[in-house]
From Swiss-Prot:
Keywords: Amino-acid transport, Signal, Transport. One of its GO terms (biological process) is amino acid transport. Belongs to the leucine-binding protein family. CDD domains: PBP1_ABC_LIVBP-like (cd06342). Residues 1-23 form the signal peptide. Component of an amino-acid transport system. It comes from the Bacteria. Transmembrane segments: none annotated. This is Leu/Ile/Val-binding protein homolog 3.
Amino acid sequence: MNLKLLSSLAFAATIGFASAAYADITIGVIAPLTGPVAAFGDQVKKGAETAVEVINKAGGIKGEKVVLKFADDAGEPKQGVSAANQIVGDGIKFVVGPVTTGVAVPVSDVLSENGVLMVTPTATGPDLTARGLENVFRTCGRDDQQAEVMADYVLKNMKDKKVAVIHDKGAYGKGLADAFKAAINKGGITEVHYDSVTPGDKDFSALVTKLKSAGAEVVYFGGYHAEGGLLSRQLHDAGMQALVLGGEGLSNTEYWAIGGTNAQGTLFTNAKDATKNPAAKDAIQALKAKNIPAEAFTMNAYAAVEVIKAGIERAGSTDDSAAVAKALHDGKPIETAIGTLTYSETGDLSSPSFDIFKWDDGKIVGLE
């Protein structure tokens, strides 16, 4: 065999491999795989991976295999932008994530400018979808919506209690706390103390002293499990019996690990329990086979992959993200593991739903 023939065969083989790689549909996952909220990133990672495995076993999307490419944002906006640029540089057109609002907002700008569609499973800040970006969707509700659920509960059941509102200064935490504050103020409750903590701090004694002086009986915390768990513990160590409330940032098992028995009774809002939805059966079985709990963030990430799949199939294109976005905006229902979803013009869920959950002896239970 001569050298020219060998070269021709080698070139043909290269083209063949390139075509095979190109045939795969790559979905990027931008999530905090390291850093203070890595526990949530891990849930999203596992949910997306499991959804892709199930989809590929069923023949993929339009006959093409789906692969994931992960980019770690560490829960930091600047690193999130770097992760987004990495995704863009790799020519990826679809993304699950980011996980936190503070990262999702700047990342959405980068992705929008470069024609990449994103479906966040967990970024709940209203600002994310309020800017009219055609490429942004989510499989979760917004902070203002979930804050109203908890505020309604407080107004109906704790109107005679002294309520304090605390946040972690972040886009998610402050947004959630401010939405809760506005809702209870509208309903006739004025908070006895409004304050903030700095992520990473360990000693909240000065804040606890202020809360104790104010006679706070209920403390709403907008933020994540690390600071929330420490605050819960230090409140009780100071002899306070204040009930801690919050959003889905307190839903991770690390909240209980940090707060210990002091976290007993903490109430938080989160998406309705998808495991009670018949549509979740296949997803739950797939997760159970891998010993993965069907937690809210995991299920939302699973559904985010399903949303991208539905959009690609409706658009009839595996690489035209604008066509896929248009297809998702058509108002038609999308069947997912967390139920039937439809999207508004902004990329928000048309009918989001939240429930209130409680920490009880280290387990999460629905509020009866």
